Every structure is written in structure tokens, then in C-alpha cells.
Amino acid sequence: MTIEEDASIWFNVVIRGDNDPIIIGKRSNVQDGSVLHTDLGAPLNIGQGVTVGHKVMLHGCTISNNSLIGINSTILNHAKIRENSIVGANSLITEGKEFPKNSLIMGLSLIHI
């Protein structure tokens, strides 16, 4: 696991990099009660300046720079959220889903605006 400069991890966060690496980029924050986990072949990469809201589950996915993951969202293996994107609260991003830069993603990853 790598936590880069000025990144913050808040209370009751679980970070499990037992299967593959986890990288948390500079100035990113992972808020209370979130879970970061990997699977074999599915590392977790959080870019720079990312906000991971309260009670978020990130599982073997990629969150690119300057993105925000809303409270209680789940993002599964091999999903990719590109730069400057927002995932709305309580969203589910299923395995392998990819979204372009500057996306607003809400719900069950069926709606892309």
C-alpha cells in the first residue's frame, strides 16, 4: 500500500491490499467508514486530489485525478472513473464499467450525463 504526500485517511477506514497493491494519490482523502480492497489482478488506484466520501466501497478499481466519489457508493473490479468526474451518492458502478473524463455518474451506472 502506498499513501502519497498530503493524503488523508479518516476514522474507521479499512484498507486491504492483501491481494494486489493499493495506491492513494497526493492530496486525496478517504472519509470515515470506507473500505478499500483488491482482488488478484485488480489493484486499486486512487489518483491525486480525489475525495472518497463516507462509507464508500472501492474494490479493485481506478479513480482518476480530481474526482469525487459520493457517500455510500460502491465501485467494483476493473471499473474506471476518469479525471474530473463525480459519482453521485449511493451509486453502484459494476465490474469493468468505464466512464470518460468530466462525467457525472449516478445510480446503477446505467445513466451517463
Task: Pin down the residues of each PLM region.
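Extended, small-residue-rich solenoid/repeat segments and analogous flexible loops
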Residues: M1-S8, N12-V14
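Glycine-rich hexapeptide-repeat left-handed beta-helix
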Residues: D18-S34, T38-Q48, G53-I111
